[in-house]
């Protein structure tokens, strides 16, 4: 799997921006992701461990142990010799290092495709520059109320965040804090499935494209309205300060790794984070509300003659408004791909 060896150097080159990439890729849950460009390396026992680039030996072990994870659908158009096959893959944007190497079924599907379609084209420098610019604190923006600012500062200190994070908008600061919650559970945006797929696709000579624009993503992440900013920061801290915040993320991540679509579909029922009509409206807007445009973008690429491997956050696959259902409504044959069972764990 020579292409994976080529993907790791690319992973190293963009690592400083990976958390910011994750911000754009997973706006639904404030505790999912955060920008590493502003993270202070852990130096004390109470700080979470920092992600590291896999060594040659670790990479070899990852390649040896790689197995299929996540949620894959085959998207078929037409019959006989004129038929075309594309793929829809539900990803997770915060993952364990052991998960970053695609398994054989996923790798073969990507290899057989013409292009990789992500929510954003995370390897386009213009996209990154626009994203970074939009996440920075805006001159003249109203400050947070003192009590809320103190609460945010206290949590930053607790999670060992460096001063550089203050360059971000307050909402992005809250999302930044979330990466440390993930690290405490052995998860990190640096190992996010989307960025790994982008590296592999580039090594394979595949085109990488975005299904959404930076403007679309940022519109869902930040606001210039002081009242909305305060609400986002307060609500985000409410989630981060929960004792079970890290465990909830770990449960969702493990559900993804095991391909348990039922758990992912019922996430709003067990996360204890969707309690009000406003919460439900926000979730609808952030997930189902974005799906029709992404489905149209996928269909446009397929109709242009490409076999597409579309990789989008797993929550976008759920329910009657999920991407599999929307593509089926467009006349495609959509079939969930079953992965081989993992080998049994042998006690040493």
Where are the predicted features?
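N-terminal secretory signal peptides that target proteins for export/translocation
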Residues: 1-16
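C-terminal soluble interaction/assembly domains
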Residues: 284-348
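Short hydrophobic "helix-edge" motifs at membrane interfaces and signal-peptide entry regions
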Residues: 20, 80-82, 303-304
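Structured, acidic catalytic/metal-binding patches in enzyme active sites
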Residues: 40-67, 71-285
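Short, well-ordered alpha-helical scaffold segments within catalytic/effector domains
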Residues: 21, 103, 291-295
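Sec/Tat signal peptide C-region and signal peptidase I cleavage site
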Residues: 35-39
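Bacterial N-terminal signal peptides
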Residues: 17-33
């Amino acid at each position: 799997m020579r292409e994976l060896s080529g993907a790791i150097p690319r992973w190293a080159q963009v690592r400083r921006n990976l958390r910011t990439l994750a911000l754009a890729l997973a706006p639904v849950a404030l505790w999912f992701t955060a920008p590493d460009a502003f993270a202070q390396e852990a130096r004390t026992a109470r700080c979470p461990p920092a992600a590291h680039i896999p060594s040659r030996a670790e990479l070899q072990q990852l390649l040896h142990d790689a197995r299929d994870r996540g949620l894959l659908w085959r998207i078929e158009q037409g019959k006989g010799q004129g038929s075309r096959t594309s793929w829809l893959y539900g990803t997770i944007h915060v993952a364990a290092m052991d998960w970053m190497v695609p398994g054989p079924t996923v790798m073969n599907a990507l290899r057989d495709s013409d292009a990789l379609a992500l929510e954003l084209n995370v390897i386009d420098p213009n996209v990154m520059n626009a994203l970074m610019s939009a996440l920075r604190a805006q001159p003249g923006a109203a400050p947070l109320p003192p009590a809320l600012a103190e609460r945010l500062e206290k949590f930053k200190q607790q999670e060992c965040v460096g001063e550089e994070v203050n360059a971000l908008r307050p909402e992005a600061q809250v999302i930044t804090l979330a990466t440390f919650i993930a690290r405490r559970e052995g998860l990190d945006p640096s190992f996010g499935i989307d960025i790994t797929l982008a590296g592999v696709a580039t090594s394979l000579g595949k085109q990488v494209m975005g299904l959404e624009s930076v403007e679309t993503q940022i519109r869902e992440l930040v606001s210039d309205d002081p009242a909305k900013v305060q609400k986002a920061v307060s609500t985000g801290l409410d989630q981060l300060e929960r004792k079970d915040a890290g465990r909830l993320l770990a449960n969702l991540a493990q559900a993804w790794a095991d391909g348990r679509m039922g758990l992912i579909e019922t996430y709003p029922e067990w996360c204890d984070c969707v309690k009000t009509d406003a919460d439900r409206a926000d979730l609808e807007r952030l997930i189902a509300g974005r799906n029709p445009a992404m489905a149209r973008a996928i269909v446009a690429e397929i109709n242009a003659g490409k076999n597409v491997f579309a990789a989008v956050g797993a929550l976008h696959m759920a329910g009657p408004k999920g991407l599999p259902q929307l593509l089926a409504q467009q006349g495609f044959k959509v079939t969930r791909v079953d992965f081989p069972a993992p080998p049994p764990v042998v006690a040493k």
